[in-house]
Amino acid sequence: MTVKTFRGSPALSEFRLTQLQQKCQQYQLPITSVYAEYLHFVEQKTSLVEDEIVKLQALLHYGSMFSELKPAGYCLIVTPRVGTISSWSSKATDIAHNCGLSKVNRIERGIAYYFNIERDLTEAELATLKDLLHDRMLETVLNHETEAALLFTQQEPKALTTIDILNGGRQALERANIALGLALADDEMDYLVESFTALKRNPQDVELYMFAQANSEHCRHKIFNADWIIDGKKQDKSLFKMIKNTFEQTPDFVLSAYKDNAAVMEGSKVGRWFPDPDGQYRVHQEDAHILMKVETHNHPTAISPFPGAATGSGGEIRDEGATGRGAKPKAGLTGFSVSNLVIPNFEQPWENPLSKPNRIASALDIMIDAPLGSAAFNNEFGRPALLGYFRTYEEKVNSFAGKEVRGYHKPIMLAGGIGNIRGEQVQKGEIPIGAKLIVLGGAAMNIGLGGGAASSMDSGKSKEDLDFASVQRENPEMERRCQEVIDRCWQLGEENPILFIHDVGAGGLSNAMPELVHDGRRGGKFDLRSILCDEKGMSPLEIWCNESQERYVLAVAPENLELFTALCERERAPFAVIGEATQAEHLILHDSHFDNNPIDLPMNVLLGKTPKMTREVLSKTVENQSLKTEGIQLKEAFHRVLRLPVVAEKTFLITIGDRSVTGMVARDQMVGPWQIPVSDVAVTTASLDSYHGEAMAMGERSPVALLNFSASARLAVAEAITNIAGTHIGEMKRIKLSANWMSAAGHTGEDAGLYEAVKAVGEELCPALGLTIPVGKDSMSMKTTWIDNGEQKSVTAPLSLVISAFARVEDVRKTLTPQLRTDKGLSSLLLIDLGEGHNRLGATALAQVYKQLGDKPADVVKVQRLKDFYNAMQTLVAEDKLLAYHDRSDGGLITTLAEMAFAGHCGVEVDISALGDNDLAVLFNEELGAVIQVADSQLESVREVLKAHNLLGITHQLGTVTADDRFEISRGSHKLFSEKRSELRSIWAELTYQMQRLRDNPECAEQEFEAKKNPDDKGLSAFLTYDVNEDITAPFINKGVKPTIAILREQGVNSHYEMAAAFDRAGFNAIDVHMSDLMIGRRNLAEFNAMVACGGFSYGDVLGAGGGWAKSILFNPKLHEQFSQFFINPNTLTLGVCNGCQMISNLAEIIPGTENWPHFVRNKSERFEARVSLVKINEVDSVWFAGMAGSHMPIAVSHGEGQVKFKSVEQFAGLKAQGIIAAQYIDNNGSPTELYPANPNGSAEGITAITNLDGRVAIMMPHPERVFRAVSNSWHPENWTEDGAWMRLFRNARMVF
């Protein structure tokens, strides 16, 4: 094979080049200018002929939006790490093959950097420059393009290694333990020596590696299952038994706990929406039970933040999909705890930057890259991210031996979510003897080795090269393909071919396959060389144990293999049958290449008889001083608190994540017309036709554990309850919790503290409240150690419990938000003080910003009061008695009130006289409680409800809401604090601005920051020129044959369900059509009246968003003809939305009347943008927008490449002259705009929807299908009932037929 190089488009925008040059200057490198462009390296099986080269060059021409320069100067080429295959490569190669380029073996991409230099670089300068250009965990720097052949080097398969314990004894195993990074404990090594001596043979490296992964703390939770002796006294229960006690006390509504990849609870009976085997989407009335899971991915995120967090989210999504016999992930949550950010030029008074080991990323780098990784995976998979938390902590505090640093050098990266599952699919099936054992998903690669064992070690205990080996690689588009297969399977009901399914996570197949057959009470016989592999030189250990992502293991009965194969082929999801289930509980892995058995073990050696841990520990107490508040000024204190990340505005973490996909999001983080990120709870509808739903909320108060372990745990549970209380759930037993425990096991005092905290929750608080914890996770190695200039250093995380609460929702429309209302007449603000006046300041945000800890933290004062509070809120919510609700948490009462005022774009006047004598304690304590806004006309009835629940005595009337721009706090007649709300809002927004300035286009960051300062911003609004509640298709109901529409999707598309639902509601028969159906002739576009190309990430947006999809049509003669005929047929309609818009714009050459259409390129911000944007509908001659001209209304936006790009000024002028610009982004005053974020992508004159000349073909970047129901709009006017404003677009299409 030979490698050919093709130049690509410029890789970096001007501001990215400027940033790079500034970094070079910062390190005093002699560089005067820099330019970067993509290089494509194509490995050919045989030489391409001229027309194939032309086709390939067209394929590799994409995304050219920056100025192209002639490459010149000193060159360095950054490529994916040699020996790995990037996900970009996998998808680009797929596109080439689907375009008929069968001679292409693989395509890889690099970036060539060209530097003008004043003199030759020294070796040290060159090393610095390379560090600036690449991530050593993921990338390689080449000196010349001829070295690109290294990217395609294939080696001969490596052989097994045998560890000679029969002759070398335990010492041989100890050497292997260190060399392979197995993290085996002493008793485990004794066990292995004993086991293999009894088998009379030496172990192979793969067997030891498999054992280490399968029995790591990460996978087997040995500490939570251990026996405990504390202060010399044997404890009755393990940690896990105390957690299980919550289920034993309150099993109500739980369908599955502790035995599967996720827990399941009862959901609502609704009309679930999916296609039947004939391809037509239909409603299926059935229970949509709720599954829940929350994972952590801390170690990989510390080592390489983007892929670490991405694969964290991906692994949790797989856990959900692999529940029962297959389930559907629905909505996600994310959380991060890191040390202090220390943002350049934004350093804060409480931040004293400490050093860190080189092998881990800084807190700032983690919070720039990790949220992008997590969001990117969720976005591309098609799961909305609706909830999260973000905490920073790093401080020297008192310890049992002087001072020590507590913080999150080893971060917490939390990924979780909910999904739905059919009742009959909740329990896994039996695995019959002879069942086919299958790996579904991508090929094995030599990455992510040892993740389970590495995650189980304190950061610093493993070798850096082992950290390097445990980095993983994400390919969410592949996971989407696999999920589509799983969906097709469970949608078959009783005919579901999946009997048993697990995801492949830590330990790779070495953990997943033994777990699969063990759980099915079987053994397995496997063929190593049947496993799909992208790297032929891998050893048996590397093939069996690597953690290549996006894979599942399944058991399928032999008679159903043909059906399963057909489903995979349609979705283009790779799979391999690698073995069969056996009656004997024995594991055999045969290697046909070397004709040996790398594994030949009884299952009980691997999983059955491993030693049980006993932990003998001492409890410790630390003396702490009370908070010193002398000299602290209220104004300065509040400004500091508003800048503390746990309190500050977190828009930079939210708008990078899709929050509208599925069309079932009823409450995301952004609240009200001003889209302020202060929601307490995330809410989804259970289906596309129901008001039943699901809710998620979180609770986390980890700094409190530095003062009181059990109080921290109780507060986490209680805060999750006060967060979720503002939606309509019913009895508290309906709420189920996930508990994620992070601890530095073995650190003095932490083990006993962990036991105390688990007992407080599992044995006491949750049983008293009737709460169940059916799922959770532990991470027991939260300590970082390193040597700095010969000095031993360490940073230890506080005991951290993150509680995620999940519940069925009776009516999603009743969900309250913190938005204060000024349009509801006179109203009052009430504080329900569950802290009962204790006003403790220990471990608060106030303490943190003054580099203190304090001594007494908040706690649950009375458990019954918490229950009464929840029940009272449920009554008030159900009866629509409240206008706004917000719990008191980080930052205290003053923050609660400020966030409510920000959301309402209004002022408040409150008097704190009744709350205590100490102003700082009253305003900044973080005791449990909530502020409610009540219309004065409802005040008496609300008081009656509070009285009935014994809360009136702890309820205090604070003051009123005002329509002006003042935030005022008084004590009687004395004004304590008075400031413009808009100025406080600006301070609160500084963190987001600073992070966006570093991460995104600084010009966009500046524009958004300025927009937030505007006290006169009108917020979102809607003006419709038609009646939103009129169904213009009503005369067609039940009359005649419905027109059919092809709901067209390609691999990676994710918005087809809601699109089909919108067209079905408008009166179409919606048919699921995959591009593979058209390619092989299962379907033909001639069958359909209309076609819609749906949104998502076809081919992961590789080769330009929508570009690969379009080129697979243009370069396929059969598809080219089929699409051409459809477009010229005057009796058809076509719609393209988001990715479908991008794709159809690339088909302009075969669509009549599109000669002036633009292409769509990367957003000006260079960031995926998920926003609610205002658009104006123009007067165009198009059936799609009939009767809508002059309207302006909100719409969901979710894209990374939505900026229009014209070939010339003349083309742009031609488009305007033709009058086919259907919609434009407008600002909150109604004027078309190019300012960010009202215009989320920077398109000229706000262009966002276009038609062809005769109006039959329309393309648009925003998502009307996600907001066709009023309830799925983040904000909408109250006179909208069931239908959203965009339902008219779909009904307009129906009027044609």
Curated annotation (Swiss-Prot):
Cited InterPro entries: Class_I_gatase-like, FGAR-AT_N, FGAR-AT_PurM_N-like, PurL_large, PurL_linker, PurM-like_C_dom, PurM-like_C_sf, PurM-like_N_sf
To which pathway does this protein belong? Purine metabolism; IMP biosynthesis via de novo pathway; 5-amino-1-(5-phospho-D-ribosyl)imidazole from N(2)-formyl-N(1)-(5-phospho-D-ribosyl)glycinamide: step 1/2
Region ranges (Disordered): 303-329
Q: Which residues does the Swiss-Prot or TrEMBL record annotate as the active site?
A: 1138 (nucleophile), 1263, 1265
Q: What reaction does this enzyme carry out catalytically?
A: N(2)-formyl-N(1)-(5-phospho-beta-D-ribosyl)glycinamide + L-glutamine + ATP + H2O = 2-formamido-N(1)-(5-O-phospho-beta-D-ribosyl)acetamidine + L-glutamate + ADP + phosphate + H(+)
Record CDD domains: GATase1_FGAR_AT, PurL_repeat1, PurL_repeat2
Enzyme Commission designation: 6.3.5.3
List localization entries: Cytoplasm
This protein's record includes keyword NADP: no
> Out of the domains of life, which is the source?
Bacteria
User: Its Gene Ontology biological processes?
Assistant: 'de novo' IMP biosynthetic process
Reply yes or no: does the keyword Plastid apply.
Answer: no
Residues that bind ATP:
308-319, 889
Q: Detail which positions bind Mg(2+).
A: 680, 719, 723, 887
Q: Name one GO cellular component term.
A: cytoplasm
What GO molecular function annotation could you give as one example from this UniProt entry?
A: phosphoribosylformylglycinamidine synthase activity
Which keywords appear in this protein's UniProt record, sorted alphabetically?
A: ATP-binding, Cytoplasm, Glutamine amidotransferase, Ligase, Magnesium, Metal-binding, Nucleotide-binding, Purine biosynthesis
Q: What does this protein do?
A: Phosphoribosylformylglycinamidine synthase involved in the purines biosynthetic pathway. Catalyzes the ATP-dependent conversion of formylglycinamide ribonucleotide (FGAR) and glutamine to yield formylglycinamidine ribonucleotide (FGAM) and glutamate.
Q: What's the subunit arrangement here?
A: Monomer.
**Family assignment?**
In the N-terminal section; belongs to the FGAMS family.
User: What is this protein called in UniProt?
Assistant: Phosphoribosylformylglycinamidine synthase
| Organism lineage string | Bacteria, Pseudomonadati, Pseudomonadota, Gammaproteobacteria, Pasteurellales
**Gene name as annotated:** purL
